[in-house]
Amino acid sequence: MDTTAEENALRREIVKTFQIHAFELKKEAVKLCVKLFLDHDKETRKKWTNKMIELLKKQTLQSSLISEELIRDTFRQCKSKGTQDAGKLLNVFDAFSLQPYDFDADLRKMVLRKEKTSLAADSSSFSHAARQRFFIVKQRAMRCASLKNFKFTTCEILGSSTKHLQSVVVLGMLTQQKADCYHIEDLSGSVEVEFKEDTKFHHALFHEHSIAIFEGTFENSVLTVNEVAMVPVESAEVTRKELSSNENWFGGDDKIAFRCSDRLRSALAKQEDTSLVFLSDVFLDDKKVMKAVFKLLQGYKDQPPVAIVFCGNFCSRPRQTDTIDLLDRGFRWLANQLTPLRKDYEKTQFIFVPGPDDPFVDTVLPRPHLPSLLFKHISPIISCTFASNPCRIQFASQEIVVFRSDLIKKTCRHSINSITVESIPSRYARSVLSQAHLCPLPQHITPVLPDFSHSLSLHPLPDLLITADRFETFTEKVVGADTIVSNPGSFSRSNYTFHVYYPCQNRVEASQIPVSELDDHSNIKNVIIFFFLF
């Protein structure tokens, strides 16, 4: 058989095989398949074709028409096999580079948004972002086993009712249209609510724009609330099972979710002692802080982590005329500390996440990376990434979200329920995971770019959520989720606390460098004074 005849036969075979599985290949996609398979025998062609089809079936596709680009990406993923070293398993995703996936209520699946994202959003973008938040929480509530016996009522039905109704249950977003007058809103309308002194608030933080379940009595167009509860938290495994999808919504070019990749899960199992270190509020202009950082770097040089994540603020004098000069000097100082250790940390990725008061960083979320002029001191010495805030980190099959913002006290300050200081960590962790969003506060309290609200979404939930906050250090795990919520605290303000995460073991170790040890050159492992295991 001549080459042309063989190509034609292969072309017909490929088209027929994909058609059997309800896929239609574009002309360019067929040409690429022929090019990829022409030099292989029949059995190899069959094996690779079946692998690609299985991979395509696991993805949420907009159409059954398959493009050349999709074939290339699918073949690349099928061909990827074996293990990689720890450094190549790590990826950092900028908030502004993430694909905007939305939940389609009609299709009941996540779909890629067709409209381009813009920094200059209009009013429709704000309403779209709010609807998406509501859709995600609502679809979790509708499939939650513990809520199956509840009959939910919409605001529209209540608004048109003139009857006295007992035990009304509404899923809605809490809003305040005027002082001391609260409403709950859903996609159909809004209804006024009234809280009593004995209204029972379940274990969470309830504030404006919280999406929650309200139960009470409806009379005279007002819902008098008896109980308020968050929607139960749903693990990533359950989310993907319910949506029947292994598609990657986290970040990067891979089509298959990292946690669903057998190759990455196998690679993670071989990284038993690999760790990631997280520090927040690292004042590079403070000599004592830099001594503590040097102590940490020296302590880990014999067994360096795969990544060290430094979160801002990076200057003790924010928003001053000399702030940028202090920062420039601080990064130069850090570079000098790293120079003699560069061989020890040649496989470690240093990640810098800006804080709320760092220069050139807008107050609107998400925030871009630090000024590029600071890169010049660090980049020639170590492998580093200047990330956005928030940012997403993938290590093997693990998904990690890092968010630097002092929102815990702000959230507590705007909460309508009374809380104790001791309960704040668990309440906050439950609230942020139930809302499936890093910043569920209203725009006038903490503004968010509506077209990039998806970058703050926690759907499905990650393996680890780092909420780098000035609040006291804590590590929490919420019932129903596999996610660890970890706050390393303020490194500079809280006597040099930091957190260490072991992804293979799914364990967080909360550590601290005692002030008395800063003049001692012993290994950092001897100065860890406490830890929590999960």
Curated annotation (Swiss-Prot):
Give the GO cellular component terms, alphabetically.
Answer: epsilon DNA polymerase complex
Name by which UniProt lists this protein? Probable DNA polymerase epsilon subunit 2
Other comments on record: In eukaryotes there are five DNA polymerases: alpha, beta, gamma, delta, and epsilon which are responsible for different reactions of DNA synthesis.
Q: Which organism is it from?
A: Caenorhabditis elegans
**Signal sequence span per UniProt?**
none
Q: Which gene encodes it?
A: pole-2
Family matches, as InterPro entries: DNA_pol_a/d/e_bsu, DNA_pol_e_bsu_N, POLE2
Transmembrane domains' residue ranges? none
Annotated GO molecular function terms are:
DNA binding
Keywords carried by this UniProt record: DNA replication, DNA-binding, Nucleus
Q: Where in the cell is it found?
A: Nucleus
